[in-house]
């Protein structure tokens, strides 16, 4: 959620979901949907029938019930992937999965729209994990929020437009800093190879200083390894760097989000 948090601090959207907070608070999908729906309703009372919600790409993995479901699906498809792939009918494919899931997770899976069910069971990435960038979490939330609003006594206008910026957010034109930083990383990596060192990752620090004062170094890849389940087996992988909920960026966001939710406070960083 690093990019999502930074975008929130720079633009002040009405709602921003931070995956790490969802996991820490053990929030359910329904609780997230209720929060969004309540904000939409509160803004509607102020005759502000518009708003912006920022959702991180990997959110679905951080919702505890969905995380359990994805882990179970990864295990199931690692063991019975061939039998699943041989089924051509979509409904039969979903029944195949539901019949093999624990009852608690089967009910979660069955409650999802079929488009999301299919996306959760599509081809895995090379590590055997669900490809979260291909799961249309934003469309799932729109459908669930729409259903939640219909159950409210007030008649609330809700017509959502979704946009996926998973790649656009990482492919903007590089700044001078980006160019200097990447050049330095590459130059340093070549120096590490030239010194005959392997299994190290190049790093540059002291980045707040001018480029000529940056410091180069190398860190062993093993120092960053973590054991995770991949293809139904334990594998060493580099652990993800997560948003620190006690860090200053998140704390600044947390202090202001209730205001941004109700009072339109959009800003343009450009």
Task: Show where each model-derived region lies.
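Accessory alpha-helical/coil subdomains and C-terminal extensions
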Residues: 1-158
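Phosphate-moiety recognition in structured ligand-binding domains
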Residues: 154, 162-270
């Amino acid at each position: 959620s690093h990019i999502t948090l930074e975008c929130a601090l720079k633009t002040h959207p009405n709602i921003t979901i931070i995956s790490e907070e969802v996991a820490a608070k053990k929030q359910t999908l329904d609780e997230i949907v209720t929060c969004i729906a309540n904000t939409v309703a509160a803004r509607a009372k102020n005759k502000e029938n518009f708003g912006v919600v920022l959702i991180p790409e990997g959110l679905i993995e951080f919702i505890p019930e969905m995380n359990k479901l994805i882990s179970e699906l990864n295990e199931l498809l690692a063991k019975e992937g061939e039998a699943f792939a041989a089924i051509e009918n979509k409904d039969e494919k979903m029944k195949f999965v539901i019949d093999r899931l624990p009852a608690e997770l089967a009910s979660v899976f069955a409650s999802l729209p079929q488009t999301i069910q299919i996306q959760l069971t599509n081809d895995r990435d090379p590590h055997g994990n669900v490809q979260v960038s291909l799961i249309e979490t934003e469309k799932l939330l729109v459908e669930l929020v729409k259903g939640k609003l219909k159950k409210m006594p007030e008649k609330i206008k809700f017509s959502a437009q979704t946009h996926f910026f998973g790649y656009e957010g990482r492919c903007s034109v590089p700044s001078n800093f980006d160019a200097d930083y990447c050049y330095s990383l590459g130059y340093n990596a070549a120096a590490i190879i030239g010194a005959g060192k392997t299994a190290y990752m190049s790093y540059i620090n002291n980045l707040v200083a001018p480029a000529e004062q940056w410091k180069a170094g190398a860190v062993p890849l093993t120092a960053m390894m973590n054991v995770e389940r991949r293809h139904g087996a334990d594998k060493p992988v580099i652990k993800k760097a997560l948003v620190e909920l006690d860090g200053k960026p998140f704390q600044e966001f947390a202090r202001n989000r209730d205001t941004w939710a109700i009072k339109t406070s959009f800003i343009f960083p450009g």
